[in-house]
């Protein structure tokens, strides 16, 4: 029997009303699956829609944004059909998020243990003494020494604050964890420690993780599957092995060429000319066409369909061959 995904995003589209009144198409037709115990990496340049995708799934979009199409199925229940009260019951208990920039996400005037305990008590999961024990368990799990749990965020290093954010996200024992650029602004050694911690916690708790990053090294380290985003759309998706060893979309290919390869340290790194499209001025055809080194005439006028190029591997490119992906 085929395993059902824990999270299934289908044809998700999001529009923004910009400050000048123009409509911006932040996401269009985004689809992917996330399975229990596995990590999906959402990869792409800044502004491609990665964080917007997470916020749409959790229904935490700003007031000037709206979901215009699609489904977000969590355990086969469409989250977009829930009332706000029902959705509040789902957040933190079923799915949680490690926000980018722990210093900004943590309350600067509350001790770390107070913040984690408050999250538990707000969701009526335990009484005060039970919540306090739970805080101790979480801090031990993420590697924060007992003598430091009562300190304030500014007393922590960047890596320690990130560990505290992970503990806070796990406070209500979710099954699905979103991690939005969890290693940003951390040095290489601390990045490795945070990634190892996420992997260890995932193995212990059986979590599904959606990891947002622009760092292909992070993806190679921890992800089972990858969705490469560009201009608010999924350009290519598949297992991490197939994406790295056999990229089908020109954008993915260029991204990988721009990443250092230790097997050929003297090789030149590729660059992608131009800039990503603005959400208010998207190309009529393929979003990547203005920057693509392999474009053909049809790319400028017609958006490519998402094709299944091999089992579990799909790409939206006119140069690819295969049946239309069944999403």
Task: Report the location of each language-model feature.
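Short catalytic/signature loops enriched in Gly
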Residues: 3-5, 149, 237-327
């Amino acid at each position: 029997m085929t395993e059902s995904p824990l999270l299934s995003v289908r044809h998700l589209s999001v529009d923004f009303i910009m400050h000048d009144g123009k409509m911006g198409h932040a996401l269009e037709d985004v689809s992917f699956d996330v399975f229990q115990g596995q990590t999906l990496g959402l990869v792409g340049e800044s502004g491609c829609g990665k964080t917007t995708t997470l916020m749409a799934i959790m229904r935490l979009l700003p007031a000037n944004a709206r979901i215009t199409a699609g489904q977000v199925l969590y355990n086969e229940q469409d989250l977009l059909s829930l009332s706000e009260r029902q959705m509040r019951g789902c957040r933190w208990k079923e799915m949680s998020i490690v926000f980018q920039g722990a210093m900004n996400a943590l309350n600067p005037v509350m001790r770390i243990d107070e913040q984690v305990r408050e999250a538990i008590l707000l969701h009526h999961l335990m009484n005060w003494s039970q919540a306090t024990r739970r805080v101790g368990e979480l801090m031990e799990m993420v590697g924060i020494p007992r003598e430091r749990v009562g300190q304030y965020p500014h007393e922590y290093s960047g890596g320690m604050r990130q560990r505290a954010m992970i503990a806070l996200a796990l406070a209500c024992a979710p099954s699905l964890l979103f991690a939005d650029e969890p290693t940003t602004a951390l040095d290489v050694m601390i990045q490795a420690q945070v990634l190892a911690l996420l992997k260890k916690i995932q193995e212990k708790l059986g979590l599904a993780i959606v990891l947002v990053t622009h760092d292909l090294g992070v993806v190679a380290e921890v992800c089972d599957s990858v969705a490469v985003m560009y201009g608010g759309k999924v350009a290519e998706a598949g297992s991490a092995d197939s994406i790295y060893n056999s990229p089908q979309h020109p954008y993915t290919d260029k991204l990988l060429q721009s990443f250092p390869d230790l097997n050929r340290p003297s090789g030149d790194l590729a660059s992608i000319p131009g800039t990503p499209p603005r959400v208010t001025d998207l190309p009529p055809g393929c979003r990547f066409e203005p920057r693509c080194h392999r474009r053909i005439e049809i790319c400028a006028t017609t958006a490519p369909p998402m094709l299944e190029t091999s089992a579990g591997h799909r790409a939206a490119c006119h140069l690819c061959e295969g049946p239309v992906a069944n999403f």
